[in-house]
């Protein structure tokens, strides 16, 4: 699925470039990374001082080293706009780090040494930031709190507008009806059988004719004794062939049928109103569950719970 993951707040792939603007332009990322860095520095400096005066728990050194790489990883993921790609791993590392920092707080907070108490304060800050990050990165992009937080970021897209949906028919499934354009003839091909009113190809004759006799007078039928030039019969045959092709294209057998299997399920992350000029599109509401048959293009063949089928833009859906 072409997820357009940027709209989820950090969905670039592993090849995304490092850009500090993704941190500076996101108040949430900037604040949490700054607090985590400050907490780590407080804990690190205080641990060095506490280790000079008296014995310091070795376990807390491991917690400091571990959280250093966790903060570095979160910073790189946000700066590279790759949060959506690595959010599962980030939550796992943060959960383990939360255990380490809270254990360090328990081993330092009850000492009378001011340095150890300061180190415990730094670990408390790290624990608080870890809880916030787990709640943020561990939630779906459609969660209300994530959408509220992401709305303040400069680089994170929001609900796509109808003006951005300039998708061509080449990306659509085979659900649109097509018809062959009628072939046009010039005067030399008609050889004197031109008519002042256009021929529509309907059995009733030309458009605007009041009676069938009036429209048929310009074109004598074979049984009426008319003399035809040599090139009339090929024209008549070709016209009949075109009419037959047009009937074949509009017959029920030639029309596209929706698929019978919908192996995928998708959730609407935004509400969508179908284009009134396109009968193939369907409307749906935010958080509505749709069944999808094909996810290879920008427009997906979808089926609603009420049985309504049609095409839906992929950038409004997320696979479940």
Curated annotation (Swiss-Prot):
The protein's name in its UniProt record: High osmolarity signaling protein SHO1B
SMART domains: SH3 (SM00326)
Organism in which the protein naturally occurs: Hortaea werneckii
One Pfam family linked to the record: SH3_1
Principal place of residence: membrane
Comp. bias (Polar residues): 166-182
Lineage: Eukaryota, Fungi, Dikarya, Ascomycota, Pezizomycotina
Function: Plasma membrane osmosensor that activates the high osmolarity glycerol (HOG) MAPK signaling pathway in response to high osmolarity.
Ranges facing Cytoplasmic side: 1-29, 81, 139-320
Record-annotated SH3 domain positions: 261-320
Entry's transmembrane regions: 30-50, 60-80, 82-102, 118-138
Extracellular compartment spans: 51-59, 103-117
UniProt keyword annotation of Cell membrane present: yes
Membrane topology, as annotated: Multi-pass membrane protein
Assembly mode: Forms homooligomers.
Positions annotated with a glycan in the UniProt record: 58
Any one of the GO BP annotations: regulation of actin filament polymerization
Keyword Iron-sulfur: no
Record's compositionally biased regions (Low complexity): 232-251
Cell compartment(s), UniProt: Cell membrane
GO cellular component terms, semicolon-separated: plasma membrane
UniProt family annotation: Belongs to the SHO1 family.
Region Disordered, annotated ranges: 160-182, 196-260
Keyword terms, alphabetized: Cell membrane, Glycoprotein, Membrane, SH3 domain, Stress response, Transmembrane, Transmembrane helix
């Amino acid at each position: 699925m072409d997820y357009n993951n940027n709209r989820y707040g950090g969905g670039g792939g592993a090849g995304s470039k490092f850009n500090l603007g993704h941190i500076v332009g996101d108040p949430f990322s900037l604040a949490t990374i700054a607090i985590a860095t400050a907490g780590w520095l407080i804990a690190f400096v205080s641990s060095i001082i506490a280790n000079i005066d008296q014995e310091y728990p070795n376990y807390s050194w491991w917690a400091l080293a571990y959280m250093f790489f966790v903060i570095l990883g979160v910073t790189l993921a946000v700066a590279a706009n790759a949060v959506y790609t690595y959010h599962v791993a980030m939550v796992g590392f943060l959960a383990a780090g939360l255990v380490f920092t809270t254990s360090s707080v328990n081993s330092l907070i009850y000492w009378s040494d001011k340095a150890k108490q300061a180190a415990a304060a730094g670990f408390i800050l790290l624990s608080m930031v870890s809880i916030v990050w787990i709640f943020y990165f561990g939630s779906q992009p459609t969660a209300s709190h994530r959408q509220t937080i992401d709305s303040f970021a400069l680089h994170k897209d929001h609900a796509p507008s109808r003006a951005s949906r300039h998708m061509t028919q080449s990306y659509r499934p085979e659900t649109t009806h097509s018809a062959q354009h009628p072939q046009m003839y010039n005067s030399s091909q008609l050889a004197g059988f031109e008519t002042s009113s256009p021929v529509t190809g309907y059995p009733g004759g030309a458009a605007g004719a009041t009676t069938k006799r009036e429209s048929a007078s310009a074109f004598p039928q074979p049984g009426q004794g008319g003399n035809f030039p040599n090139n009339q019969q090929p024209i008549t045959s070709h016209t009949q062939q075109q009419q037959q092709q047009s009937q074949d294209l509009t017959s029920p057998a030639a029309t596209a049928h929706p698929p019978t299997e919908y192996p995928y399920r998708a959730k609407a992350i935004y509400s969508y109103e179908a284009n009134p000029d396109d009968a193939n599109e369907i409307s749906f509401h935010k958080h509505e569950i749709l069944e999808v048959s094909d996810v290879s293009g920008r427009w997906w063949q979808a089926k609603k719970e009420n049985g309504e089928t049609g095409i839906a833009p992929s950038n409004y859906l997320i696979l479940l």
